[in-house]
Amino acid sequence: MKKMPMRKRFGQHFLHDSFVLQKIVSAIHPQKTDTLVEIGPGRGALTDYLLTECDNLALVEIDRDLVAFLQKKYNQQKNITIYQNDALQFDFSSVKTDKPLRVVGNLPYNISTPLLFHLFSQIHCIEDMHFMLQKEVVRRITAEVGSHDYGRLSVMAKYFCDNTYLFTVSPQAFTPPPRVESAIIRLIPRHNFTPVAKNLDQLSHVVKEAFSYRRKTVGNALKKLINPSQWPLLEINPQLRPQELTVEDFVKISNILN
């Protein structure tokens, strides 16, 4: 079958290392009855492995040439549905299933953060997620309070999910090799986080505002939102830096604004 050219604007790096592919599938541990959604399947390297493990697989691919390639490659498969769609705009709840989705994929590095936020907005229909991401992004997601990598993505990811850094993948596992290392992460939705954010948009705004001034104290960083008299009510020291605040702290700040 004719190979498809890579498109730089889609951030395409195709995984080809069979050992890494098998390791990813083992981490996902798909079951026959699962409904899997693969984002950015490319030429189907991971898809081939997933098809042998589950009976319901959906592919979301934006590249029309790759969609045509995949349709031809899997035209005899009855357990696969291909959506030509931008994952940033895709309604994951539209996938026909009576079970929560298991979402997987080698996410394009140039859209990985906004795509994660899009998935967080649809977390109600997701059982878990396993992604290949730039190693730096995985470090930011899993960063602990007070660390250099702890920031907006860390806070929001921890609010929505329990996150586990699984393993690193070298550039040589891809064609063409990216200039950075990659890593596999597991994200399991948290449906009972406490305290509950009353307004998720407000929470996101507070976190974004705080980390826009991460070298300032949180009292100064959020002075447009929180007046000095409110900090004692929150039981948060306004002299702390944003990276020293827990997810719970940010939720409390967000909730006092509602």
Swiss-Prot record:
PROSITE patterns: RRNA_A_DIMETH, SAM_RNA_A_N6_MT. InterPro entries: KsgA/Erm, rRNA_Ade_diMease-like_C, rRNA_Ade_Mease_Trfase_CS, rRNA_Ade_methylase_Trfase_N, rRNA_adenine_dimethylase, SAM-dependent_MTases_sf. Belongs to the class I-like SAM-binding methyltransferase superfamily. rRNA adenine N(6)-methyltransferase family. RsmA subfamily. One of its GO terms (molecular function) is RNA binding. Specifically dimethylates two adjacent adenosines (A1518 and A1519) in the loop of a conserved hairpin near the 3'-end of 16S rRNA in the 30S particle. May play a critical role in biogenesis of 30S subunits. This is Ribosomal RNA small subunit methyltransferase A. One of its GO terms (cellular component) is cytosol. It is an enzyme of class 2 (transferase). The gene is rsmA. S-adenosyl-L-methionine binds at H13, L15, G40, E61, D86, N106. Keywords: Cytoplasm, Methyltransferase, RNA-binding, rRNA processing, S-adenosyl-L-methionine, Transferase. Coiled coil: none annotated. It comes from Coxiella burnetii (strain RSA 331 / Henzerling II). It is found in: Cytoplasm. Its main location: cytoplasm. It catalyses: adenosine(1518)/adenosine(1519) in 16S rRNA + 4 S-adenosyl-L-methionine = N(6)-dimethyladenosine(1518)/N(6)-dimethyladenosine(1519) in 16S rRNA + 4 S-adenosyl-L-homocysteine + 4 H(+). It comes from the Bacteria.
